[in-house]
Amino acid sequence: MNDKWTPSINLDLMDVINTQSIKGVQVGSPEAFIFEIMGEAELPATRLSKKSKIINHLYGNVNFLSENGYVIAINIDFHGNREKMITLGDIGSWGVNDWFELSELKGWSLNNLDGVMRILGGGIVIELSKEGELSMVSLR
């Protein structure tokens, strides 16, 4: 573990959305791929709770969750203060209408629940504020 962790890669979020993977690591990948492709994690891998079988691998604003040796989810946080391995790129200035257009283009559904907008597509969940500010992207 490094004293000051820095991401070994930086990717644009739209690349992650389009490929639903991070440098080839995707849901269903062997857990060993995480370290092979991403390098050293920011913190040691830890269980979500004492009795949980789910292990969290933290890489800046990205959490890889694994269970029984396989990746089961990838969460990308845009509200936290961690180093950004995944950046917003051009979509950083998007508003609600832009996200609506993307969801229509991809054939994804858009739901609004108590001021949180959620775009749901095959294996991806994108969460936005009612103003269209991106908070979380989850690959499942």
Role assignments for model-derived ranges:
Residues 1-140:
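Short helix/turn-capping signatures at newly exposed starts of structured segments
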